[in-house]
Every structure is written in C-alpha cells, then in structure tokens.
Design a protein with these regions (language model features):
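Short, flexible loop/turn elements at secondary-structure junctions
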Residues: 8, 49-51, 103-105
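Phosphate/oxyanion-binding active-site loops and adjacent basic polyanion-contact surfaces
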Residues: 16-28, 53-59, 108-116
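P-loop NTPase nucleotide-binding core
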Residues: 59, 64-154
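A short, basic N-terminal segment
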Residues: 1-45, 65-94
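Walker A/P-loop nucleotide-binding motif
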Residues: 41-61
Length: 154
C-alpha cells in the first residue's frame, strides 16, 4: 500500500504555503495577524486537532512567515521576498525570534532545558557576538541559574 502522507519538513511547509493546495493560507495569515496585534504579555496558545490534521504544518508555516519578516533570520533573499509577497497584510508582523521545539524529538532527554537551549541555538538567528561575548555567557549562565537553581553567576 502506498503512503500519501507528507512529512512536515520546512521545504514542504514552504511549498504548501506557496501553492496553497488545501486553501489554508488564510487561516495561517489570520494567526500571524493575531500574533502581531497581541500586547507585550505572555500568552499560551493551544492548537487542537486529530493526529495528521496539519498542526505541525500550520506552526511551521506561521514560523516561515515570521522568519521572513525578521531581518536577523538566515534565509535566502528570494525565499524571504516570496514569503513576504504571499503574506499581504496592512502591517508587517513584528520581528520575532522563532524557535521550533519538537518535544517528541527530545522526549528521551533527561534535561528538557538543555534540549530547548539546543533547539534555540539551531534556530537560524544571526547574532553578532564579536562585541560582547562575555555578556552572552553571563546571560546564558543566568538562564541556567534560573532553571536549575544552581548558582553559576556568583
């Protein structure tokens, strides 16, 4: 029996965003607009759907749009322009540093904080650390302290 499922890779999410075969882009764009109009508070968002209903693709497509509008994100200029053209809104989204964290991938790790930090480090954000590498280390140590209760900063 042939499998017709599509793996939720970044390339496939981009292709579905470009081609819009199931007419879902409007929902993706509405969600990006919702994020853009949220106040500066903390929010939790739950996406509920059956297995295989497209939650992962939805999140990855939202991430692509946000990344395309973030000048600090590594992305080919042509891809960035095409995604920005697809997302036609009165306002461009805020510039967010996005991190895709797949909890199932890291399910067997003992310390979820380390896997989260790893996922963030692989996120594709540009960073100029040449001016203040010690500040970066201090910030990383403070995050470690906060999550572990250990005291690296003293």
């Amino acid at each position: 029996m042939r499998n017709y499922s599509l793996n939720p890779t970044e390339e496939n999410a981009y292709k579905l965003l470009r081609e819009n075969p199931i007419q879902r882009n409007e929902y993706v764009f509405q969600f990006v607009r919702l994020l853009t109009h949220m106040e500066d508070n903390c929010y939790s968002v739950a996406l509920n759907g059956d297995w295989g209903s497209g939650k992962t693709f939805f999140v990855k497509q939202v991430k692509l749009i946000l990344d395309a509008h973030n000048p600090q994100f590594h992305m080919k200029d042509e891809t960035r322009r095409e995604i920005q053209t697809l997302y036609k809104a009165d306002e461009k989204p805020n510039s967010y540093a996005t991190v895709y964290y797949d909890a199932w991938t890291y399910d067997n790790h003992d310390d979820p904080i380390l896997s989260l930090v790893y996922a963030a480090s692989q996120s594709g954000q540009k960073a100029d650390l040449s001016d203040s590498p010690s500040h970066v280390l201090e910030a990383a140590a403070a995050v470690f302290d906060a999550f572990t209760g250990k005291n690296l900063t003293s």
